[in-house]
Amino acid sequence: MDNLQPDQFEDMLSSKEKALVMFYADWCPYCRKFKPIFEASANSYTDDRPKFFQSNIDSDENPLWEKYSIIAVPTVIAFENGNIISRRDGKMGIGLGKSDLESILKETNSAR
């Protein structure tokens, strides 16, 4: 799974493939809990599977915070043809879980 830097997003967005990006921060305990779930899914999900990416947005200066209106981490955003087709924002005090990932994958696969 690729770790996207801000300057690599345009290449990812210009791809015709569906992409699922997890935005996270190393200091976030909910991200540390969710990251293995995301990685396991990236390694096992096969049906019309989107390409999985992660993007570490530790720094407040990272332009992706504002560009994608990220207010909590982890946040998972699904893209197709450069457009956002679905997203899940981390819930305060909870983060994201396996059911959140499963629901965004289902939505991503049904978006055609």
Predicted regions and their residues:
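Structural signal for hydrophobic/aromatic residues that build the beta-strand cores
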Residues: 20-21, 38, 52, 76-78, ...
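A short glycine-leucine-enriched loop at secondary-structure breakpoints
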Residues: 66-71
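Core residues of folded domains in eukaryotic genome-function proteins
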Residues: 17-19, 48, 72-75
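Thiol-based oxidoreductase modules, predominantly thioredoxin-like and allied folds used
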Residues: 2-4, 23, 35, 42, ...
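Local sequence-structure signature of Cys/Sec-based thiol-disulfide redox active-site neighborhoods
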Residues: 8-43
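Short hydrophobic/charged patches on amphipathic alpha-helices used for structural packing
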Residues: 9-10, 62-65
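Non-catalytic, surface beta->alpha helical segment in thiol-disulfide oxidoreductase systems
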Residues: 72, 77-112
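Short aromatic-centered micro-motifs
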Residues: 27, 49, 78
